Amino acid sequence: MPTPSMEDYIEQIYILIEEKGYARVSDIAEALSVHPSSVTKMVQKLDKDEYLVYEKYRGLVLTPKGKKIGQRLVYRHELLEQFLRLIGVNEENIYHDVEGIEHHLSWNAIDRIGDLVQYFQEDERRIEALRNIQKRNEQGE
């Protein structure tokens, strides 16, 4: 199982490959706001752990194992953003909040959050009812 730091790298590499067709060390460093030397060290570790194949100066490719985890990590991130929007978290807080919680939830918790998001999306009246509760609670403060 990858560490939270490894997950951040795998997720970002997956996103870059999906968007651009490739992921370079410099692109990863820029996206994660870290030094290229840190990226190189982590990429070597991810290569050793078979999440990707890295050839110096030639780039990297996610293995099937890395792709599968990358997809799941992107899903988790997007689901948590969706959930926080659904429950009315201010837009300017969402990214930071997701980054703060995503590594601390079990996959079981993520799946249950997915169920809850689906529950609300299946009937707009449920979302309206939640908004009404939130308005009442805010007025009561």
From Swiss-Prot:
<dbReference type="GO" id="GO:0003700">
    <property type="term" value="F:DNA-binding transcription factor activity"/>
</dbReference>
<dbReference type="Pfam" id="PF02742">
    <property type="entry name" value="Fe_dep_repr_C"/>
</dbReference>
<dbReference type="InterPro" id="IPR001367">
    <property type="entry name" value="Fe_dep_repressor"/>
</dbReference>
<comment type="subunit">
    <text>Homodimer.</text>
</comment>
<feature type="binding site">
    <location>
        <position position="102"/>
    </location>
    <ligand>
        <name>Mn(2+) 2</name>
    </ligand>
</feature>
<feature type="binding site">
    <location>
        <position position="99"/>
    </location>
    <ligand>
        <name>Mn(2+) 1</name>
    </ligand>
</feature>
<dbReference type="InterPro" id="IPR050536">
    <property type="entry name" value="DtxR_MntR_Metal-Reg"/>
</dbReference>
<keyword id="KW-0804">Transcription</keyword>
<dbReference type="InterPro" id="IPR022689">
    <property type="entry name" value="Iron_dep_repressor"/>
</dbReference>
<dbReference type="InterPro" id="IPR022897">
    <property type="entry name" value="HTH_tscrpt_reg_MntR"/>
</dbReference>
<dbReference type="InterPro" id="IPR036390">
    <property type="entry name" value="WH_DNA-bd_sf"/>
</dbReference>
<feature type="domain" description="HTH dtxR-type">
    <location>
        <begin position="1"/>
        <end position="63"/>
    </location>
</feature>
<dbReference type="GO" id="GO:0030026">
    <property type="term" value="P:intracellular manganese ion homeostasis"/>
</dbReference>
<dbReference type="GO" id="GO:0005737">
    <property type="term" value="C:cytoplasm"/>
</dbReference>
<keyword id="KW-0479">Metal-binding</keyword>
<dbReference type="GO" id="GO:0030145">
    <property type="term" value="F:manganese ion binding"/>
</dbReference>
<dbReference type="GO" id="GO:0003677">
    <property type="term" value="F:DNA binding"/>
</dbReference>
<dbReference type="GO" id="GO:0046983">
    <property type="term" value="F:protein dimerization activity"/>
</dbReference>
<keyword id="KW-0464">Manganese</keyword>
<comment type="similarity">
    <text>Belongs to the DtxR/MntR family.</text>
</comment>
<feature type="binding site">
    <location>
        <position position="11"/>
    </location>
    <ligand>
        <name>Mn(2+) 2</name>
    </ligand>
</feature>
<dbReference type="InterPro" id="IPR036421">
    <property type="entry name" value="Fe_dep_repressor_sf"/>
</dbReference>
<feature type="binding site">
    <location>
        <position position="102"/>
    </location>
    <ligand>
        <name>Mn(2+) 1</name>
    </ligand>
</feature>
<dbReference type="InterPro" id="IPR036388">
    <property type="entry name" value="WH-like_DNA-bd_sf"/>
</dbReference>
<keyword id="KW-0963">Cytoplasm</keyword>
<feature type="binding site">
    <location>
        <position position="99"/>
    </location>
    <ligand>
        <name>Mn(2+) 2</name>
    </ligand>
</feature>
<keyword id="KW-0805">Transcription regulation</keyword>
<keyword id="KW-0010">Activator</keyword>
<keyword id="KW-0678">Repressor</keyword>
<keyword id="KW-0238">DNA-binding</keyword>
<comment type="function">
    <text>Central regulator of manganese homeostasis.</text>
</comment>
<feature type="binding site">
    <location>
        <position position="8"/>
    </location>
    <ligand>
        <name>Mn(2+) 1</name>
    </ligand>
</feature>
<dbReference type="InterPro" id="IPR022687">
    <property type="entry name" value="HTH_DTXR"/>
</dbReference>
<protein>
    <recommendedName>
        <fullName>HTH-type transcriptional regulator MntR</fullName>
    </recommendedName>
</protein>
<feature type="binding site">
    <location>
        <position position="77"/>
    </location>
    <ligand>
        <name>Mn(2+) 2</name>
    </ligand>
</feature>
<feature type="binding site">
    <location>
        <position position="103"/>
    </location>
    <ligand>
        <name>Mn(2+) 1</name>
    </ligand>
</feature>
<dbReference type="Pfam" id="PF01325">
    <property type="entry name" value="Fe_dep_repress"/>
</dbReference>
